[in-house]
């Protein structure tokens, strides 16, 4: 239960801010729970179906607060779901930018990933999911679990690290200072 007498300190792992169009929404300890709805394009043939989902979500009386675009197919920016959410809905737009990278031999290009993130942030995405904690130690510990990896994006980061034989940092840690400077 939330205690009103507890002092909440922003940016100390209690509260963070999400961009919602031209306003900032505070989320975290002591704030209302936000509801996230997932959409995404895995096949180009599903584009119209996913657009209909957004239209149906817009008609809901008690809709979500956030719409996350989990697309794995990169399309023209103006047609992308995250862009439509930013420009045509009242919802916070969220993405998983690593899904849109074109890996070569399962290696992720940090410049391409950063370019995707910057483009999305510059055009109004309020929340991006990153996987900076994946490392060799976590990989070894996860191998003992029945389901070692439960995150598609985390799995992509891990695969990149394995191919690089854990030499160097996780792809997100390499570009984290730039991500923070744009955020």
Regions found by a protein language model. Give the residues of each.
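Alpha/beta enzyme core
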Residues: 1-183
């Amino acid at each position: 239960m939330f205690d009103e007498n507890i002092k909440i300190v922003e940016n100390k792992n209690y509260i963070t801010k999400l961009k919602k169009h031209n306003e900032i929404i505070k989320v975290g300890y002591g704030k209302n729970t936000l509801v996230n709805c997932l959409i995404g394009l895995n096949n180009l043939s599903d584009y119209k179906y996913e657009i209909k989902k957004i239209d149906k979500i817009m008609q809901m009386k008690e809709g979500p607060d956030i719409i996350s675009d989990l697309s794995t197919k990169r399309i023209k920016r103006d047609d992308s779901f995250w862009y439509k959410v930013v420009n045509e809905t009242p919802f916070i737009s969220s993405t998983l930018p690593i899904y849109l990278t074109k890996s070569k031999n399962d290696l992720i290009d940090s410049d391409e990933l950063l370019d995707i993130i910057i483009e999305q942030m510059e055009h109004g995405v309020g929340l991006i999911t990153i996987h900076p904690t994946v490392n060799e130690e976590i990989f070894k510990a996860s191998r003992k679990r029945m389901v070692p990896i439960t995150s598609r994006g985390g799995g992509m980061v891990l695969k990149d690290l394995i191919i690089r034989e854990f030499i160097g940092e996780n792809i997100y840690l390499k570009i984290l200072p730039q991500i923070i400077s744009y955020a």
